[in-house]
């Protein structure tokens, strides 16, 4: 299993225009409190905008950065599930930039990648936060040890001076004797890289294992060598500053003298800190570590020391029309060790790859990452003996500030039924947080791209099971269990295991069929094309829409028409409602009648539109049900959304006929692809019933239902 987590893109932003996924043609998109479809977001001035295309080649959009994407603004954009604050929480220069998206013209490799393998359109990031918390979920299953621990929902909550210490998944693999490794060109802990060197060569602090104390990152060779250089050079720097201060004072320039003395004092403090660190981290203390501790460190911080140029840049020169342009690029192979291990058949059972910033797809850097993904795929597929037993997972840590139209499924607060309910025995205390001026479920966060490449996920399919970053851990657990190894990440909460799958529904038998692979990208050509866009005009956004514009707008045209094969999913979901007195009683069930032990639990979002859009969250374990009640006023409108576009709406009024509608699956334990609608008339009068198929074109049916029938 090879996992590459890239940076900061939402699903709609990347793949909303891809054929056959739940993108801009979603027939059951969320409705906002103001009655508009979810696409039409309103800013603080009251102006409403729709999604619009960002032209990567015709503008400099990939050079102008990203959007707010911290705990506060992610929580605010969701707005307790109402989902109507995106433009207010994610501002950028008074433009509706969050609604910008790309299509196949801009991302040809990624679309070809999805067409060749399986793209997942119900994959959410793990938390309503930024990079580091989401990456903590990928490597450890949580953002804290337990519900009593502080929730590390901000990037700065976990850092070199705020280390974590709970057990991580690589440690569990190590204890079970399962090989693993984290590949990067160079770590982020200071090793002397500066400016563009850091952007092209270091791992962009995207390996959060650097911040777990048990991995002892300060023993890293590059960092210790940097300390040695600093300790050797700083005394002269300090002496020069002190001499400069004396000279300035003698010349009567007291302010300059004080500035030099201040700088010298700072350098003395740095020298003292470096010397103290060298006492703790040196060859002698390294040799005193246990073999296990050394192995954890070496595997977590596997860098490209074997390439003599791995810390060097060179200049790429190219022609852009009549202009000759230059751009710094890595001189060495940023995938050197991963390439070498793959070619020699030495890849471990589980590998994580961490890209440098400029290859990470992060909006803070130009979008060079397509080459990096292409190169990883090319490395894996060049060795048939490796490829025939490899699963390559491409995922993204978070959405940055880019809009996605599917509200995430989140955990309800324990003991607060107004926020939702779960099956009995699911404690969500660890899944919610009050931190940094916000109270919110920690996750799930917004949808992000997830593509799984392997011989068993070929063929351009779409998978619509709910996944998050812990799904990658669960995949490894399931795979190892099939090999007789019991490795379980206990940091993953029961709620998260109930609602998020293990990716196994993606895979199907492989019998040697030919696979059409995306054409590998050339590194320099990719860089040239993206770098040249730096000199284009800024992107333009769509205009503000009137009420008439909103009514007539059709966002579906942004998405490619057609369908793609869909992976079968073991969801057997039933949601029914009936009136009891002054309440609407809604039952949500995840049955096991058809799929048995393979049946999935499911999350649901409940929307009460007649009360200004109040939102409740549910989690139903397979084989169980959850029931909730909603007051009935003069009118009621309750909508329940589940995975894969599952939706039930119940709408009426206090004085309407009391007719109960039940929808199930025809065919019993051998479903035939049809639904079965049962009507129960609890009213005192016979009722005329119309059954209207609004999706698949079946003819209108009329029924007369007697009282009590």
Which residue stretches match the model-derived regions?
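N-terminal pro-sequences and low-complexity stem/linker regions of secreted or lumenal proteins
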Residues: 1-709
């Amino acid at each position: 299993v090879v996992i590459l987590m890239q940076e900061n893109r939402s699903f709609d932003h990347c793949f909303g225009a891809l054929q056959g996924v739940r993108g801009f043609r979603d027939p059951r998109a969320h409705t906002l409190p103001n009655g508009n479809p979810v696409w039409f977001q309103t800013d603080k001035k009251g102006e409403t905008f729709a999604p619009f295309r960002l032209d990567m080649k015709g503008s400099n959009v990939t050079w102008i950065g990203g959007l707010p994407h911290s705990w506060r603004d992610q929580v605010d954009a969701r707005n307790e599930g109402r989902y109507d604050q995106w433009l207010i929480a994610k501002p950028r220069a008074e433009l509706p930039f969050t609604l910008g998206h790309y299509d196949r013209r801009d991302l040809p490799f990624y679309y070809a990648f999805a067409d060749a393998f399986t793209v997942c359109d119900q994959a959410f990031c793990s938390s309503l936060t930024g990079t580091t918390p989401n990456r903590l979920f990928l490597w450890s299953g949580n953002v804290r040890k337990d519900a009593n621990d502080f929730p590390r929902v901000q990037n700065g909550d976990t850092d070199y001076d705020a280390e974590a210490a709970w057990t991580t998944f690589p440690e569990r693999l190590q204890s079970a004797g399962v090989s693993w490794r984290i590949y990067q060109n160079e770590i982020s802990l200071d090793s002397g890289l500066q400016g563009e060197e850091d952007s092209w060569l270091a791992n962009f602090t995207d390996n959060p294992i650097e911040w777990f104390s048990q991995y002892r990152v300060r023993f890293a060779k590059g960092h210790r060598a940097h300390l040695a250089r600093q300790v050797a050079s700083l005394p002269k720097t300090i002496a020069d500053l002190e001499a400069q201060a004396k000279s300035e004072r003698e010349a009567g320039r007291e302010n300059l003298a004080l500035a030099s003395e201040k700088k010298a004092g700072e350098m003395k403090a740095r020298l003292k800190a470096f010397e103290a660190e060298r006492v703790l981290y040196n060859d002698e203390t390294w040799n005193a570590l246990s073999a296990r501790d050394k192995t954890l460190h070496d595997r977590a911080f596997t860098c490209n020391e074997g390439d003599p140029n791995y810390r060097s840049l060179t200049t790429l020169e190219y022609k852009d029309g009549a202009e000759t342009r230059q751009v710094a690029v890595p001189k060495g192979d940023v995938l050197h060790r991963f390439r070498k291990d793959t070619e020699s058949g030495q890849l471990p059972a589980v590998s994580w790859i961490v890209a440098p910033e400029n290859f990470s797809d992060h909006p803070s850097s130009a979008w060079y990452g397509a080459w990096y993904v292409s190169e990883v795929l090319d490395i894996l597929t060049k060795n048939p003996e490796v490829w025939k037993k490899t699963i390559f997972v491409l995922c993204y840590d978070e959405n940055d500030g880019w809009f996605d139209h599917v509200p995430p499924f989140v955990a309800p607060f324990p003991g607060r039924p107004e926020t939702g309910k779960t099956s009995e025995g699911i404690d969500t205390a660890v899944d919610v947080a009050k931190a940094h001026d916000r109270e919110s479920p920690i996750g799930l966060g917004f949808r992000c791209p997830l593509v799984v490449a392997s011989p068993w996920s070929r063929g351009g399919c779409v998978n619509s099971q709910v996944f998050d970053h812990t799904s990658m851990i669960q995949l490894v657990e399931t795979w190892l269990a099939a090999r007789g190894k019991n490795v379980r990440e206990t940091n993953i909460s029961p709620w998260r295991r109930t609602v998020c799958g293990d990716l196994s529904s993606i895979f199907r038998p492989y019998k040697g069929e030919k696979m059409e692979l995306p054409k590998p990208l050339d590194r320099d050509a990719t860089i040239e094309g993206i770098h040249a866009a730096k000199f284009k005009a800024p992107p333009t956004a769509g205009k503000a829409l009137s009420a008439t514009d909103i009514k007539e707008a059709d966002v579906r045209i942004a998405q490619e028409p057609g369908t793609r094969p869909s992976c079968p999913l073991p969801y057997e979901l039933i949601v029914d409602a009936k009136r009891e007195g002054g309440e609407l009683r809604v039952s949500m069930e995840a049955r096991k009648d058809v799929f048995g032990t393979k049946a999935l639990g499911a999350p649901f979002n409940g929307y009460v539109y007649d009360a200004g859009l109040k939102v409740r969250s549910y989690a139903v374990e397979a084989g169980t049900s959850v029931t909730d009640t909603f007051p009935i006023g003069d009118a009621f409108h309750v909508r329940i959304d589940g995975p894969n576009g599952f939706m039930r709406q119940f709408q009426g009024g206090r004085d309407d006929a009391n007719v109960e509608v039940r929808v199930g699956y025809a065919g019993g334990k051998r479903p035939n692809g049809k639904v079965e609608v049962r009507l129960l008339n609890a009213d005192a009068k016979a009722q005329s019933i119309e059954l209207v198929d609004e999706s698949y074109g079946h003819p209108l049916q009329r029924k007369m239902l007697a009282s009590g029938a």
